[in-house]
Each structure stands twice: as C-alpha cells, then as structure tokens.
Design a protein with these regions (language model features):
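Cytosolic ends of transmembrane helices, especially the final helix of ABC transmembrane type-1 domains
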Residues: 88, 196, 219, 243, ...
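Transmembrane helices of ABC transporter permease
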Residues: 32-33, 65-80, 141-192, 265-276, ...
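Membrane-integrated ABC transporters
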Residues: 1-42, 55, 59-65, 83, ...
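Primarily ABC-family ATPase nucleotide-binding module
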Residues: 319-364
Length: 364
C-alpha cells in the first residue's frame, strides 16, 4: 500500500495510497460530478418558477417544477450518502492494510536500520493512519465536490452573459495562484510541526519508561525542563504553520469578497440594462451563494490536506526502511546432514552512513 522507495514526495505517496482503490475513487468522483450538476437544478428551477409567477402562469407546470427541484435536492443527498459509504470502506481498508503491512515489515527490517532509531518510538507513526483515514473523507468528498461545484457554477453563470466568462477565468487563475504560491511552504511547516509533536510524545514515553529512576532520584526537574524545551519547539513550529494557514485563509477570503462584489455588480448592471430578467438574476444570486459555500469548504479543507500529506510522510519513516532479502539457503533443509562452512577473506565492515570501519581485513 505504501511505496517502499526513498525520497518520495508526500504527493507521490498519496497517489500510491489511492492507486489500488482507483475504481472506488473513480466512483466517488462520478458521484461528485453528478452532485455538482444536480445542484445546478436548484437555481435553474427557481429561475423558471419565478418566470412563471411573474407571468401569472401558476398552473400544473409550476407544480411540476417545484416537484422536480425538490426531487433534485433529495437525489443530491442520496449521492452524498453513496459517497460516504465508499469513503468509509476505503478508510477501513487503509487501516487494515497499514496494520498488516507494519506487522509484516517490522520483523524483516534490516538490523542496521535500527542502529540510529528507537523502534517502539517509531511505531507511534502508526497513529497517523487515523489522521489519513479522517482526512481522506475531506479530500475525496468535500474538496473535490467543492472544486467541481465552483467550476460548474462559473460555467453556468457564463451562459447568462459573456462578461461572466472573463470573470470566471480570472477567478480560476487566482485560485490556482493561491495554492501554487503557498502550498509548498504550508506542507513544509506541517511536516516540521509533526516532527516536534513526535519528539514531545517520545520524551513523555521515556519519562514513563524510567519512572522508577525519577522516583528514586528525588524531586528531579528534568522531566519538566525537557518537556518545556520540546513543547516550546513544537509551539514555534505550529505557529509557523498557522501563519501559512492564516495567509491562505486571508487570500481565500479576499478572493471570496472580490468574487461576491464582481458577480453582484455585473448581475445588477445587466438587470438594469435589461440584459437579464429578475428570474435570471435571482438564479445567479443563488449560484453565487453556492459558490461562497464551496469556497468556505475549500478554506476549511486546507489544513486537513496538509495533515494527510504529512501523515503519509511520517508513515514513510517506517515503510521506507529497507527489508532483509528473503532469498538464500534453507539451512535446516540443505545443511542438516553435511553441515556448513563459512570462510572470510579480507572481510571489512562498517555501519551504514559511518565512515569508520569497525572490522578490517578479517580472515577466518
């Protein structure tokens, strides 16, 4: 499930995570597309209803339109339920696969890989699987659905007047620039924050492991001093990450205000110039409200996306460790009768990453 390759980017790890379940994820996106299209039935239906009311045509057509709009809302809710079911299955599968993979890999990791690592502390990374589980729902449902609704909403607005086309293209470019300019730094600060989070947990585990030593030493201040040190580092890292989030939130809010002002102004001018009727204007305002709601979801999902990508990077601290080779001799079967002879000629040994040779020119 998790790629066993070094120096994978968090995004590459994410694609590796979802690739085995691409069929289910494809269904989630299909439901999201249909949901985005069905959502547009609400403003279009209301536009048609207002036009009928203005024309004093309150007849069976009006009743049918009301029924169809209500049916569209219900169908959209049903699509969301289908999405939730698929994502829940994926979450359960991710947890199960991760647990099995950890259990398989841990006994097979090369011994030299543990020389500079503390295995029990490294297993804390498994808790990031829960973060990935919860965040996957946001990424696959909220983020994708909101993005599609923004695109579909802007496309629909473009049919009302060519001015909306230019405005929509400008807004899409601005969203892309916001993510491009801030996403990389946000991920870096999120990973740094997570690093100090685990250092804090590791120190607390060490205090718990050596609790008898601290009791016998009397009123030791070491637990509090070191806790204060690692916690301060965590708070610094968290504040750095929050500043990036704050910057992104600010830019998205500015984008939201600009979009609201622009769309309302263009719509109002078109109504006064009689290039749009009241029904179209009301429908456009409903679309704008839907776009605002989608942008709010995008803003709220940013931190979750960082958490998922950071979690994958932290889980990689275990899954990237090299495994022992499984091929070789079956000593019990091949050597039970004849025995086995081992000969060393000019044998040298040093630990991985160290320059100093521990054993040199050994002959046996």
């Amino acid at each position: 499930m998790f790629e066993n390759k070094s120096k994978l980017t968090p995004l590459e790890r994410f694609w590796g995570l979802i690739h085995p379940d691409r069929k289910e994820i494809k269904n989630v996106y299909i439901y999201a597309i249909f949901s985005g299209i069905v959502n547009l039935s609400l403003p279009l239906g209301i536009q048609a209803i207002i036009n009928l009311i203005q024309g004093a045509q309150i007849n069976s057509s009006w009743i049918i339109l009301v029924f169809l709009v209500t049916l569209g809302v219900a169908f959209n809710g049903l699509l969301n339920i289908f999405q939730l079911r698929i994502v829940e299955n994926l979450q359960q599968k991710i947890f199960t696969k991760a647990a099995i993979e950890f259990a398989y890999r841990i006994p097979r990791i090369k011994m030299e890989q543990w020389q500079k690592k503390y295995a029990p502390e490294l297993m804390n990374r498994f808790f990031d699987i829960v973060t990935i589980q919860k965040g996957l729902s946001t990424m696959l449902i909220d983020f994708s659905t909101s993005s599609l609704q923004i695109i579909f909403g802007l496309i629909l607005l473009s049919f009302y007047h060519p001015f909306f086309i230019i405005f929509s293209l400008l807004l899409i470019v601005l969203i892309g620039l916001i993510f491009r300019l801030t996403a990389k730094k946000g991920l870096e600060t999120s990973i740094n924050e997570s690093t100090y989070k685990y250092k804090t947990v590791h120190w607390l585990e060490e205090v718990a492991r050596t609790t008898l030593t601290f009791k016998l030493s009397g009123d030791s201040t070491l637990p509090l001093k070191n806790t204060d040190k690692v916690t301060s580092k965590y708070l610094e890292a968290r504040e750095s990450h929050f500043q990036i989030l704050l910057k992104q939130y600010g830019l998205m809010v500015a984008f939201k205000v600009m979009m609201t002002l622009g769309l309302l102004a263009i719509g109002g001018i078109l109504v006064m110039e009689q290039e749009m009727n009241i029904g179209q204007f009301v429908a456009a305002e409903i679309i704008i409200l839907m776009l605002m709601n989608s942008i709010e979801k995008l803003i709220r999902s940013l931190e979750t996306i960082y958490d998922v990508l950071t979690g994958l990077e932290k889980v990689g601290a275990v899954t990237d460790l090299d495994l022992e080779k499984s091929e070789g001799m079956d000593m019990e079967k091949d050597c039970s009768e004849c025995g086995m002879k081992i000969e060393l000629v000019d044998f040298n040994f040093r630990y991985p990453g160290d320059q100093k040779i521990i054993l040199k020119a050994i002959n046996l």
